Amino acid sequence: ATHNCYGVDLNPTAVDLAKVSMWLNIIYKHSKTPWFNLRLSSGNSLIGARLQVFKEADLKSKRGRGVENYLDRVPERINLINGRHDDEIYHFFIPDVGMAGFDKDKVIKGLLPDEVKTIKDWRKPFTEEFTYAQIRTLKRLSNKVDELLTSHLNNRERLLKATDDNIPIWPNSNKTEGLPIKAKELQEKDLYRATSAYRKLKLMMDYWCSLWFWPIEKAGDLPT
Protein backbone atom coordinates (compact mmCIF):
# COMPACT_ATOMS: atom_id res chain seq x y z
CA ALA A 1 0.00 0.00 0.00
CA THR A 2 2.83 2.42 0.78
CA HIS A 3 4.07 1.93 -2.80
CA ASN A 4 0.79 2.47 -4.62
CA CYS A 5 -1.30 5.12 -2.90
CA TYR A 6 -1.02 8.84 -3.63
CA GLY A 7 -3.19 11.68 -2.44
CA VAL A 8 -3.38 15.37 -1.58
CA ASP A 9 -5.86 17.41 0.45
CA LEU A 10 -6.04 21.01 1.60
CA ASN A 11 -6.92 19.87 5.12
CA PRO A 12 -3.92 18.42 7.03
CA THR A 13 -6.31 16.60 9.37
CA ALA A 14 -7.88 14.83 6.39
CA VAL A 15 -4.41 13.71 5.32
CA ASP A 16 -3.71 12.28 8.78
CA LEU A 17 -7.06 10.49 8.79
CA ALA A 18 -6.26 9.02 5.37
CA LYS A 19 -2.98 7.66 6.74
CA VAL A 20 -4.76 6.07 9.70
CA SER A 21 -7.45 4.62 7.43
CA MET A 22 -4.83 3.08 5.13
CA TRP A 23 -2.96 1.65 8.09
CA LEU A 24 -6.11 0.03 9.52
CA ASN A 25 -6.83 -1.56 6.15
CA ILE A 26 -3.43 -3.23 5.83
CA ILE A 27 -2.57 -4.00 9.45
CA TYR A 28 -1.63 -7.56 10.37
CA LYS A 29 0.04 -9.34 13.27
CA HIS A 30 3.56 -8.02 13.99
CA SER A 31 3.27 -5.51 11.13
CA LYS A 32 5.18 -2.25 11.23
CA THR A 33 3.46 1.10 11.13
CA PRO A 34 3.46 2.12 7.43
CA TRP A 35 4.90 5.50 6.49
CA PHE A 36 2.91 7.44 3.90
CA ASN A 37 4.55 10.88 4.19
CA LEU A 38 6.07 10.89 0.69
CA ARG A 39 2.80 9.86 -0.94
CA LEU A 40 0.01 11.47 1.09
CA SER A 41 0.44 15.19 1.72
CA SER A 42 -1.37 18.46 2.34
CA GLY A 43 -1.68 20.86 -0.57
CA ASN A 44 -3.87 22.17 -3.38
CA SER A 45 -4.56 19.67 -6.14
CA LEU A 46 -6.50 22.16 -8.30
CA ILE A 47 -4.20 25.19 -8.42
CA GLY A 48 -0.58 24.99 -9.47
CA ALA A 49 2.02 24.95 -12.22
CA ARG A 50 2.59 21.88 -14.37
CA LEU A 51 5.34 20.28 -16.42
CA GLN A 52 4.10 21.89 -19.61
CA VAL A 53 5.93 23.95 -22.21
CA PHE A 54 5.52 26.52 -24.97
CA LYS A 55 7.45 26.40 -28.22
CA GLU A 56 10.09 29.06 -28.78
CA ALA A 57 8.42 30.09 -32.06
CA ASP A 58 5.18 30.95 -30.22
CA LEU A 59 7.05 33.34 -27.93
CA LYS A 60 8.55 35.27 -30.86
CA SER A 61 5.33 35.75 -32.83
CA LYS A 62 3.64 39.14 -32.62
CA ARG A 63 -0.03 38.66 -31.89
CA GLY A 64 -2.27 40.32 -34.43
CA ARG A 65 -4.90 39.85 -37.09
CA GLY A 66 -4.77 36.23 -38.16
CA VAL A 67 -1.55 35.61 -36.22
CA GLU A 68 -1.50 33.62 -32.99
CA ASN A 69 1.22 33.42 -30.37
CA TYR A 70 1.69 31.92 -26.91
CA LEU A 71 -1.32 33.82 -25.52
CA ASP A 72 -3.57 31.80 -27.84
CA ARG A 73 -1.87 28.45 -27.27
CA VAL A 74 -2.28 25.76 -24.64
CA PRO A 75 1.10 24.59 -23.30
CA GLU A 76 2.04 21.02 -24.14
CA ARG A 77 2.66 18.45 -21.47
CA ILE A 78 6.12 16.90 -21.43
CA ASN A 79 7.10 13.35 -20.55
CA LEU A 80 9.58 12.98 -17.70
CA ILE A 81 11.26 10.09 -19.48
CA ASN A 82 11.73 11.84 -22.83
CA GLY A 83 12.38 15.23 -21.27
CA ARG A 84 12.10 18.74 -22.69
CA HIS A 85 13.37 19.79 -26.12
CA ASP A 86 15.77 22.72 -26.45
CA ASP A 87 13.18 24.90 -28.24
CA GLU A 88 10.64 24.51 -25.42
CA ILE A 89 10.14 26.87 -22.47
CA TYR A 90 8.38 25.94 -19.24
CA HIS A 91 4.97 27.58 -19.06
CA PHE A 92 5.47 28.92 -15.52
CA PHE A 93 7.98 31.44 -16.88
CA ILE A 94 5.40 32.82 -19.31
CA PRO A 95 2.69 35.44 -18.57
CA ASP A 96 -0.99 35.03 -19.30
CA VAL A 97 -3.74 37.54 -20.05
CA GLY A 98 -5.84 36.00 -17.27
CA MET A 99 -3.41 37.05 -14.54
CA ALA A 100 -4.77 39.67 -12.11
CA GLY A 101 -7.99 39.58 -14.09
CA PHE A 102 -9.94 42.13 -12.07
CA ASP A 103 -10.57 44.32 -15.11
CA LYS A 104 -12.94 41.62 -16.41
CA ASP A 105 -15.31 42.21 -13.46
CA LYS A 106 -17.81 45.06 -13.96
CA VAL A 107 -18.46 45.48 -10.23
CA ILE A 108 -14.78 45.80 -9.36
CA LYS A 109 -14.24 48.17 -12.29
CA GLY A 110 -16.87 50.46 -10.78
CA LEU A 111 -15.49 50.24 -7.24
CA LEU A 112 -11.76 50.51 -7.94
CA PRO A 113 -11.30 52.20 -11.33
CA ASP A 114 -7.76 53.44 -10.62
CA GLU A 115 -6.48 50.00 -9.63
CA VAL A 116 -8.17 48.42 -12.64
CA LYS A 117 -6.50 50.95 -14.95
CA THR A 118 -3.14 50.18 -13.33
CA ILE A 119 -3.65 46.48 -14.06
CA LYS A 120 -4.62 47.11 -17.68
CA ASP A 121 -1.62 49.38 -18.20
CA TRP A 122 0.63 46.74 -16.61
CA ARG A 123 -0.71 43.84 -18.66
CA LYS A 124 -0.10 45.32 -22.11
CA PRO A 125 3.74 45.36 -21.99
CA PHE A 126 3.79 42.33 -19.69
CA THR A 127 2.19 40.11 -22.34
CA GLU A 128 4.11 41.32 -25.40
CA GLU A 129 6.10 38.97 -27.59
CA PHE A 130 9.56 38.10 -26.28
CA THR A 131 12.85 39.42 -27.61
CA TYR A 132 15.66 37.07 -28.63
CA ALA A 133 17.64 38.08 -25.52
CA GLN A 134 14.67 37.29 -23.29
CA ILE A 135 14.19 33.90 -24.95
CA ARG A 136 17.86 33.05 -24.35
CA THR A 137 17.31 33.85 -20.67
CA LEU A 138 14.16 31.71 -20.59
CA LYS A 139 16.10 28.82 -22.11
CA ARG A 140 18.77 29.09 -19.43
CA LEU A 141 16.10 29.14 -16.75
CA SER A 142 14.38 26.11 -18.28
CA ASN A 143 17.70 24.25 -18.35
CA LYS A 144 18.14 25.04 -14.67
CA VAL A 145 14.65 23.71 -13.95
CA ASP A 146 15.62 20.46 -15.68
CA GLU A 147 18.66 20.18 -13.39
CA LEU A 148 16.65 20.93 -10.25
CA LEU A 149 13.89 18.55 -11.26
CA THR A 150 16.35 15.72 -11.89
CA SER A 151 18.05 16.43 -8.58
CA HIS A 152 14.78 16.39 -6.64
CA LEU A 153 13.51 13.22 -8.30
CA ASN A 154 16.81 11.45 -7.57
CA ASN A 155 16.77 12.62 -3.95
CA ARG A 156 13.18 11.48 -3.55
CA GLU A 157 13.92 8.09 -5.09
CA ARG A 158 16.83 7.58 -2.71
CA LEU A 159 14.61 8.50 0.23
CA LEU A 160 11.89 6.10 -0.91
CA LYS A 161 14.41 3.27 -0.96
CA ALA A 162 15.92 4.26 2.38
CA THR A 163 12.51 4.38 4.08
CA ASP A 164 11.11 1.25 2.45
CA ASP A 165 9.85 -1.41 4.87
CA ASN A 166 10.62 -4.82 3.44
CA ILE A 167 8.04 -7.48 4.16
CA PRO A 168 9.38 -11.05 4.20
CA ILE A 169 7.30 -13.33 1.99
CA TRP A 170 7.82 -17.10 1.90
CA PRO A 171 10.09 -18.64 0.71
CA ASN A 172 12.26 -15.53 0.99
CA SER A 173 12.35 -15.01 4.73
CA ASN A 174 15.18 -12.46 4.83
CA LYS A 175 14.07 -9.85 7.29
CA THR A 176 15.73 -6.43 7.28
CA GLU A 177 15.23 -3.80 9.92
CA GLY A 178 13.67 -0.63 8.54
CA LEU A 179 14.36 2.86 9.79
CA PRO A 180 12.40 4.10 12.81
CA ILE A 181 9.71 6.71 12.14
CA LYS A 182 11.82 9.51 13.64
CA ALA A 183 14.74 8.75 11.30
CA LYS A 184 12.40 8.74 8.31
CA GLU A 185 10.98 12.11 9.28
CA LEU A 186 14.47 13.60 9.62
CA GLN A 187 15.38 12.43 6.12
CA GLU A 188 12.09 13.81 4.80
CA LYS A 189 12.85 17.17 6.42
CA ASP A 190 16.19 17.25 4.62
CA LEU A 191 14.45 16.61 1.28
CA TYR A 192 12.35 19.75 1.78
CA ARG A 193 14.95 21.99 3.46
CA ALA A 194 15.05 25.68 2.48
CA THR A 195 17.99 25.27 0.07
CA SER A 196 16.77 22.04 -1.55
CA ALA A 197 15.98 21.57 -5.23
CA TYR A 198 12.33 21.10 -4.22
CA ARG A 199 12.13 24.51 -2.53
CA LYS A 200 13.75 26.28 -5.47
CA LEU A 201 11.28 24.70 -7.90
CA LYS A 202 8.36 25.46 -5.62
CA LEU A 203 9.37 29.12 -5.29
CA MET A 204 9.37 29.58 -9.08
CA MET A 205 6.02 27.87 -9.50
CA ASP A 206 4.41 29.65 -6.54
CA TYR A 207 5.50 33.01 -7.96
CA TRP A 208 3.76 32.23 -11.27
CA CYS A 209 0.62 31.09 -9.43
CA SER A 210 0.58 34.23 -7.27
CA LEU A 211 0.06 36.42 -10.35
CA TRP A 212 -3.36 34.85 -10.86
CA PHE A 213 -4.46 35.89 -7.36
CA TRP A 214 -2.63 39.19 -6.98
CA PRO A 215 -4.51 41.44 -4.49
CA ILE A 216 -6.04 44.37 -6.33
CA GLU A 217 -5.11 46.81 -3.57
CA LYS A 218 -1.46 46.07 -4.44
CA ALA A 219 -1.89 46.58 -8.18
CA GLY A 220 0.94 49.10 -8.16
CA ASP A 221 3.36 46.39 -6.98
CA LEU A 222 2.78 44.02 -9.91
CA PRO A 223 6.14 42.84 -11.33
CA THR A 224 7.33 44.05 -14.72
What is each PLM-predicted segment?
Residues A1-T224:
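SAM-dependent methyltransferase catalytic region
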